[in-house]
Swiss-Prot record:
<comment type="similarity">
    <text>Belongs to the HAD-like hydrolase superfamily.</text>
</comment>
<dbReference type="InterPro" id="IPR051828">
    <property type="entry name" value="HAD-like_hydrolase_domain"/>
</dbReference>
<dbReference type="InterPro" id="IPR036412">
    <property type="entry name" value="HAD-like_sf"/>
</dbReference>
<dbReference type="InterPro" id="IPR023214">
    <property type="entry name" value="HAD_sf"/>
</dbReference>
<dbReference type="Pfam" id="PF00702">
    <property type="entry name" value="Hydrolase"/>
</dbReference>
<dbReference type="InterPro" id="IPR044924">
    <property type="entry name" value="HAD-SF_hydro_IA_REG-2-like_cap"/>
</dbReference>
<protein>
    <recommendedName>
        <fullName>Haloacid dehalogenase-like hydrolase domain-containing protein 3</fullName>
    </recommendedName>
</protein>
Amino acid sequence: MSLRLITWDIKDTLLRVRVPVGQQYFAEAKRQGLCMDPGSLETSFRNAYRTHSRLFPNYGLAQGMDSRQWWLDVVLQTFRLSGAEDDETVRSVAQQLYQDFSTARNWAVVPGAREALDSCKGLGLKMAVISNFDRRLEEQPMKDEPAADHMGYKRYPAASPGAGGAAVFCRSQEARSLYGPRFLGDIVP
């Protein structure tokens, strides 16, 4: 039995954050006149992210949020936990950071990703990118990075923050009309 499709997750498989989040938040805060500690921002981000993920899973979709609002709230909470008091400036920082993470400049190709994609392409394997990360990685960063060269960038229904666990793979199977025991997990115990 041959493989008919290889799916790749976007975040931390093909792309990763270029520099630690605390440093990126620090740089934007400094640019807008806030004096913050990058280490504190990193710790606060991890706490805010963990709390928000627990309270509003899948970017708050079940609670009527979109990923933009979810991320803005995480950034606002991050700065509050780090002691920022200027809400107006923090909101401006949050808006800018959301935009910045929508660009390729804040993302880096994971070492080995290009080579893995090249190898799969050389073998004639069909590939798709799926992710339950928010839709920003489907936009510009994804178009500029390795998968675009190999997969003819296309949004699949599986690339949805609402699709978690196995559902994301089932959606990719449906999108490519590949039914039956054709996935690696079906042929390798």
